[in-house]
UniProtKB/Swiss-Prot annotation:
Its EC number is 2.3.1.-. This is Putative polyketide beta-ketoacyl synthase 1. PANTHER family: 3-OXOACYL-[ACYL-CARRIER-PROTEIN] SYNTHASE, MITOCHONDRIAL, POLYKETIDE SYNTHASE-RELATED. One of its GO terms (molecular function) is 3-oxoacyl-[acyl-carrier-protein] synthase activity. The active site is at C170, H310, H347. It comes from Streptomyces coelicolor (strain ATCC BAA-471 / A3(2) / M145). Residues 3-417 form the Ketosynthase family 3 (KS3) domain. Keywords: Acyltransferase, Transferase.
Amino acid sequence: MTRRRVAVTGIGVVAPGGIGTPQFWRLLSEGRTATRRISLFDPSGLRSQIAAECDFEPSDHGLGLATAQRCDRYVQFALVAASEAVRDANLDMNREDPWRAGATLGTAVGGTTRLEHDYVLVSERGSRWDVDDRRSEPHLERAFTPATLSSAVAEEFGVRGPVQTVSTGCTSGLDAVGYAYHAVAEGRVDVCLAGAADSPISPITMACFDAIKATSPNNDDPAHASRPFDADRNGFVMGEGAAVLVLEDLEHARARGADVYCEVSGYATFGNAYHMTGLTKEGLEMARAIDTALDMAELDGSAIDYVNAHGSGTQQNDRHETAAVKRSLGEHAYATPMSSIKSMVGHSLGAIGSIELAACVLAMAHQVVPPTANYTTPDPECDLDYVPREARERTLRHVLSVGSGFGGFQSAVVLSGSEGGLR
């Protein structure tokens, strides 16, 4: 079967420090961080009391009270990001065949925030097991189930083709775009809204990561807490947000006169069958994902101009990822800039993969590599070029974005400049 070429024609982003792609790119290109003390609830009892929050008010972005009540925060993020992406693509969904349009969105924790809130209501703050269901909000089931993420976006834009929610932990955003890529490339749809959303800054989610000491306890210096690849790194900073890309059959995009940012040229995902949170030091599974994505893109590792790292800022992840990139790219790894935007916008779990892909598309559009903020002290086991603290101009033709998720998920996406230059 001939695989169709898949174009990226629109981007929408809701991220800490930057709602909308102009603000998001400004934050990244300036190397600023969005981490601060948690304001969404009182974090005093937590080990890690900091996060990268979105300055988000639903009504500021065209979401009415009914939508805000019906949808959890993460779905609100996705609706705003999808609307921006569709506008950016200059795509009139009313003129598209709804059966030839899809929506594939990812999330790691779904509506945990709303579920936690309602449990407090119905159980009188956890004091009773015979819960009072009269206290529950009428939209609770729709608000917390992960399926709502994709169905709400599909409903908003009249999408009647394949609609699916992907939940593969912290690779959900990459995998959602990867699955959408296959749907377009294989001719099942002509256009697909693809991305992810999560709003995990809630007491129970923060406590979960506190329990395994995965998050940074640098509460006295939030701006410098996330330090991917730095020798003094001590965990990630929780984030939140959403990003949606419009993926289209390249010929379909050309026929309607759309501007094209770039193409999705390769995708792969593998599991490590090893440990829920542990990673093999050698990085074999991530390297296999990279190699397979490169094969699909018909590229050698030496063609990659920039690697967007998972770069969570935990000791084991950053060593594992460095080893994987060196295994796949060989000596070229040492000449390839590799940075982590989690140093600036935190780790939004399932959403971060799509947010990072949006950053990659913008990096290609501007021909600028975003930096790794807060990188000051080299780690002998992490010995690549992590673009410390300042953005860097560079010719970007092919970009690799990689992700790693609890549960052993390892994914990679390759983006390539489209013929005729970039948007």
